[in-house]
Amino acid sequence: MTDRYEQINDYIEALLKPRPDNVKRLEAYAEEHHVPIMEKAGMEVLLQILSVKQPKKILEIGTAIGYSAIRMALELPSAEIYTIERNEKRHEEAVNNIKEFQLDDRIHVFYGDALELADAVHVTAPYDVIFIDAAKGQYQNFFHLYEPMLSPDGVIITDNVLFKGLVAEDYSKIEPKRRRRLVAKIDEYNHWLMNHPDYQTAIIPVGDGLAISKKKR
């Protein structure tokens, strides 16, 4: 992440209202155990968008330990959230965390690879919001697979589309090569998304970058 980009995020995070202790405990656990969760500033923007949109049903691709799903459920008391996690340990942690927050009646966790669960997830479609926050190299595949399950006025939100600001730099020399390929994949996804014939997209440079995509009328 570039110094300037990081400074801006730090500034925004310093302005945020304190979060409940149980939420801060999740954040501390994620940091200690290197679990990727949304950056705080990006999370607040996501919640603001959801509070305006007031979705009744949300699909999240990439549960991790349940942090984002829990934050969304707390913000939207009447929303149902369906979320997918392929890592067995994180799936178990997410289920336990959701129960601790007493949200297991509204947050439903699928275990498995999102690329293989479309049929199961389709049963509870359509979704008013689809939130993509899983394997970055598969973003375009996730979009293709789940976009048909979006409600007519729904939005698709993708996290990490700026990837520490690296997509805006000359990433041809990034090492290791695996990281370079991942940055290239995200850059490719951004260009594809911005030129999608059926969606209009805005990219918001907050957190690690959010793309907000809505069907064209």
UniProtKB/Swiss-Prot annotation:
Disruption phenotype: Deletion mutant does not contain mo5U. Pfam families: Methyltransf_3 (PF01596). CDD domains: AdoMet_MTases. It catalyses: 5-hydroxyuridine(34) in tRNA + S-adenosyl-L-methionine = 5-methoxyuridine(34) in tRNA + S-adenosyl-L-homocysteine + H(+). Keywords: Magnesium, Metal-binding, Methyltransferase, S-adenosyl-L-methionine, Transferase, tRNA processing. Its EC number is 2.1.1.-. One of its GO terms (molecular function) is tRNA (uridine) methyltransferase activity. InterPro entries: Cation-dep_OMT (IPR050362), SAM-dependent_MTases_sf (IPR029063), SAM_O-MeTrfase (IPR002935), TrmR_methyltr (IPR043675). Homodimer. Belongs to the class I-like SAM-binding methyltransferase superfamily. Cation-dependent O-methyltransferase family. This is tRNA 5-hydroxyuridine methyltransferase. It comes from Bacillus subtilis (strain 168).
